[in-house]
């Protein structure tokens, strides 16, 4: 999948993905009911383990099956397709979120978030790698 994504990025473009936090602590996950979203782990964590993501909406719960991948796996796969600069960004609460609910409300989520943002810019070296792999020159 990373191969397909990276070939669509122009040099200087970047992959930004909201993904399951590879540093999940199963017994510290915030309650779905408290934040209106969360994850359920049906079993132990391992690369490829299914994870149920639940979002509580006005029309009822929305459930999505996702999969857990370790940070090492994400980074290894991205490096295989020529991405060298990989950044992880913790979830943040806006000033309005703090103002509306207070800091104490967000403490559990910020300490153990179920999601994280992965950012991987495509540089010129990655562009060359993709062209070699595809055997073509992409704009």
What are the residue ranges of the model-derived segments?
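Class I S-adenosyl-L-methionine
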Residues: 54-57, 92-107
